[in-house]
Amino acid sequence: MDKLSIREDNYNIKHKTISLNRASSVTRNLKGLLKFLGPAFVVSVAYIDPGNFATNISGGSSFNYNLIWVILWSNLMAIFLQTMSAKLGIATGCSLPEMCAKVFSKRANWIFWIVGELGAMATDLAEFIGGTLGLYLLFRIPMIYAGLLTGVLTFIIVYMEKYGQKMVETIIAALIAVICVAYTIELFLARPAWTQVGMHTLIPSLPNGEAVLIAVGMLGATVMPHVIYLHSELVQHRNTNSSDKEKLHHLKMEKIDILIAMNIAFVVNAAMVIVSAAVFFKHGIKVSTIEEAHRSLQPLLGNLSSGAFGIALLASGLSSSAVGTMAGQTIMKGFVNLSIPINLRRIITMLPALIIIALGINPMRVLVLSQVALSFILPFPIIQMLLIAGRKDLMGILVNKKFTKIVGFIIATMIILLNIILLYLTFTGQT
């Protein structure tokens, strides 16, 4: 009997030890993962910016749940390109602009810098106006004062980088969380038809010609050029740049970071379409402006819904505007090895937006024109990245494999063609 008791005790001790070891291993793995989380959350902000609000709301209010699949495909392409950008940064120990400076001629890099800066400024213009609109809709602050306050708030976010990149990543992740909570509230209040949501997420459909136009707008303007540049820079803060084994581990962790962050962005974008379909389409309201969407939510779903919408728009505008400023710094430093104080850059980039606000120009029109500008610029970082990431002498063990090159070429061609179509439709007045 004593021997049996001893055996049972030994068995229990052994299994408790195994359980403790497993728990300890899970804790270690989680801590290791948390150390690498952050860069993808920063760049994911570009995929839930005020421009996305406009296109997603338009798509849902016009075509019910039919265009949710566009969000899914856009997200898959974005994951692929952001992974390649991060891989380039990890493999080379340099950002994409820095690698361009090494690979291409000085004249070419000056052109790349000008084009990249224009892209960052066009993006920042849209984000800044989105943040301003958020403040205006929430607090009815006059647009010009809301613009000045947006400038101050985004400067504070960017200034926090002084205390380390992790600080900025945490602030932006918190703002993303605010957007997620706001749209969770919206979904709860909207009560969508989930069966239709699931069907239209997986089954592509384009009811008519106008749906094609909106789908092109949603898909063609999804990938933002400035965050392709920025992602390759953000991974440097965790890049030991030593052995191939460490690079492979870093890439593995960053892929997890990208999958988590980009799928959160997918859920938020899908929620925008779903809420718009469940509320506006259901009641026969075709929404064409952000202000109209905010105004229409209140009588249909109440103050909580319109308030959540305003908060989400404000958080989106502030976070994405801050990211645009960071990207501008990366672009200038990388291509031409120049830099200006972050506060001066913030002032320079906010001036065009303040002028537009002061002149009373329609913010929705500005959002459209900024997307057009980005459409011109987008091919540059994609082609640069594909050329560099395909070179074994630069990428080493992380060089793009043949299959990755083919997929990259197909995605790049598709995005560029869609943007050309979007430009044509915009200039011919069909958007």
From Swiss-Prot:
GO terms for cellular component: plasma membrane. The chain crosses the membrane at residues 33-53, 61-81, 110-130, 141-161, 170-190, 211-231, 258-278, 307-327, 347-367, 368-388, 406-426. GO terms for molecular function: cadmium ion transmembrane transporter activity; manganese ion transmembrane transporter activity; metal ion binding; symporter activity. The keyword Transmembrane applies. It is found in: Cell membrane. It comes from the Bacteria. It is a multi-pass membrane protein. The keyword Hydrolase does not apply. Its main location: membrane. Keywords: Cell membrane, Ion transport, Membrane, Plasmid, Symport, Transmembrane, Transmembrane helix, Transport. GO terms for biological process: iron ion transmembrane transport. H(+)-stimulated, divalent metal cation uptake system. NCBIfam families: nramp (TIGR01197), Nramp_1 (NF037982), PRK00701.1 (NF001923). Belongs to the NRAMP family. This is Divalent metal cation transporter MntH. The gene is mntH.
